[in-house]
């Protein structure tokens, strides 16, 4: 991640206390810099800056420790629906159900899809209890025209 956080610092600046240097490390004259007094002064300044920056950052992240992250509830063998991000006309938003094969704290691997899927893009597939109808029943009747059928809906 290279986006500055709430303190306006990049990850490099958090670790090293300054923007990244533009130095050619393949230069043969680099060996002179390793023992130079300016490098020693820079390293001491770096240590001071790190002490100043790390305290406020530690306090900012300490607030998050009070609220532990709860991993997703999905386990191997569960049935899940996978979100379809680009739906076409009359296409359902969720596809599946798929069986969960592997899990990590943030992602799932499901049977039939090659890529890992983030847990936020998945929902549990609930099945109705055995012996109960999930919706209305439909009855098919022939009509006099061989190219047509009549569908009638019955009570659930």
Curated annotation (Swiss-Prot):
Enzyme Commission number(s) from the entry: 2.7.7.-, 3.1.-.-
Post-translational modifications reported in the UniProt record: Specific enzymatic cleavages by the viral protease yield mature proteins. The protease is released by autocatalytic cleavage. The polyprotein is cleaved during and after budding, this process is termed maturation.
InterPro entries per the UniProt record, alphabetical: MLVIN_C
Ranges in coiled-coil conformation: none
Cross-referenced Pfam families: MLVIN_C
UniProt keyword Protease, yes or no: no
Cofactor binding annotation: Magnesium ions are required for integrase activity. Binds at least 1, maybe 2 magnesium ions.
Cofactor: Mg(2+)
GO molecular function, one term: metal ion binding
Top-level taxon in the UniProt lineage: Viruses
Keywords: DNA integration, Endonuclease, Hydrolase, Magnesium, Metal-binding, Nuclease, Nucleotidyltransferase, Transferase, Viral genome integration, Virus entry into host cell
A single GO BP: symbiont entry into host cell
More details: This protein is translated as a gag-pol fusion protein by episodic readthrough of the gag protein termination codon.
Function: Integrase catalyzes viral DNA integration into the host chromosome, by performing a series of DNA cutting and joining reactions. This enzyme activity takes place after virion entry into a cell and reverse transcription of the RNA genome in dsDNA. The first step in the integration process is 3' processing. This step requires a complex comprising the viral genome, matrix protein and integrase. This complex is called the pre-integration complex (PIC). The integrase protein removes 2 nucleotides from each 3' end of the viral DNA, leaving recessed CA OH's at the 3' ends.
The protein's name in its UniProt record: Gag-Pol polyprotein
Organism: Mink cell focus-forming murine leukemia virus (isolate CI-3)
The organism's taxonomic lineage, starting at the top: Viruses, Riboviria, Pararnavirae, Artverviricota, Revtraviricetes
């Amino acid at each position: 991640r290279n986006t500055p956080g709430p303190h306006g610092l990049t990850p490099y600046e958090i670790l090293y206390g300054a923007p990244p240097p533009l130095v050619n490390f393949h230069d043969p004259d680099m060996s002179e810099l390793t023992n130079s007094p300016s490098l020693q002064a820079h390293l001491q300044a770096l240590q001071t800056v790190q002490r100043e920056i790390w305290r406020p950052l530690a306090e900012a992240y300490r607030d998050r420790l009070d609220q532990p992250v709860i991993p997703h509830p999905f386990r191997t063998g569960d049935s899940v629906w996978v979100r379809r991000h680009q739906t076409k006309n009359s296409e359902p938003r969720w596809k599946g159900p798929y069986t969960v094969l592997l899990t990590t704290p943030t992602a799932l691997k499901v049977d039939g899809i090659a890529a890992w899927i983030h847990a936020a893009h998945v929902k549990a597939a609930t099945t109705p209890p055995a012996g109960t109808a999930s919706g209305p029943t439909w009855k098919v009747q022939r009509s006099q025209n061989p190219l047509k059928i009549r569908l009638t809906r019955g009570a659930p």
